[in-house]
A protein has these predicted regions:
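N-terminal accessory interaction module
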Residues: 172-248
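Charge-enriched, short contiguous segments at helix-coil
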Residues: 43-46, 112, 117-168
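Short, charged amphipathic alpha-helical segments flanked by flexible coils
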Residues: 88-117
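Short, charged/polar, low-complexity loop and linker segments
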Residues: 56-63, 102-106, 133-134
Length: 251
């Protein structure tokens, strides 16, 4: 059975996530941007948008009455829910998450796993959200303003994230190491809600493939979704190699 010279990847078979992480670690400095997939296109699903709910919330925030504060929190909750569902709709995850009755807290954890929120921001957002939405009190104006800023920032991040490329290609070139591989391709399959990786070798029969599906393993899917996002940013030269490795927890 043929092997690469950098590590004993068995050519012609599928990788698991740990093996793929090792592959990225060993080849990331040899990746050269090649091609990109277009962002996904979908039809608008909801009549109102997150931005409109934010506008409603801002109008209420300008009024200091108790009713306006309570209404403001309600609009912010809808802005958050609508933005999460809009983002999931883009990637054809909305129906899957609905079918599984996934709650907002879990949706936020999923978004955090994709790299949109760090753990501290996620905890802070959930703590404020729980206090605002579940306690029978008139919320403090300072807390509302913090909540408003957090929701606005997340809406902006997910709006931008919905227009990220649905895939990217890299050539594999290195003067310092010998590798049997010459191309890395990662793509999002909107129809099957899965992420497909292909690592091309010199001979087609020696190509390595790796696919993870939201339907079968949501944790692995979330990680590979983050890989796709990080490699897109690497392709755009927005982030460096070492930062991508840290974000993907590859040591």
């Amino acid at each position: 059975v043929p092997y690469t010279l950098t590590r004993r990847y068995v050519i012609g078979v599928n990788l698991n996530i740990q093996e793929f992480k090792q592959f990225i670690k060993e080849h990331i400095h040899a990746l050269e941007p090649s091609g990109k997939e277009n962002p996904l296109k979908v039809q608008k699903r909801f009549q109102l948008t997150p931005r409109e709910y934010l506008s409603f919330a801002e109008n209420e925030l300008n009024n200091s009455s108790d009713v306006s504060r309570i209404n403001c929190v309600s609009h912010l909750k809808r802005a958050l829910d609508c933005q999460l569902d809009t983002y999931f709709h883009t990637f054809n995850l909305y129906e899957l998450f609905n079918k599984r009755a996934i709650k907002v807290k879990t949706k936020l954890e999923f978004i955090g796993a994709l790299g949109f929120l760090n753990s501290r921001s996620l905890v802070r957002l959930n703590n404020i959200r729980n206090g605002m939405e579940h306690d029978y009190v008139v919320p403090d104006i300072a807390d509302i303003e913090v909540y408003f800023d957090l929701i606005t920032a997340l809406v902006q991040l997910l709006e931008h994230g919905a227009f990220e490329a649905a895939g990217c290609d890299f050539g594999i070139y290195s003067d310092t190491s010998c590798s049997d591989f010459n191309e890395l391709i990662i793509k999002y399959d909107q129809h099957n809600t899965s992420i497909h990786v292909q690592i091309k070798a010199g001979e087609e029969e020696n190509n390595i493939t790796f696919t993870t599906s939201a339907e079968t393993n949501i944790e692995d899917f979330a990680y590979m979704f983050k890989v796709l996002r990080m490699l897109n940013l690497l392709w755009d030269c927005q982030w460096g190699h070492e930062f991508v490795l840290r974000e993907l927890e590859i040591t």
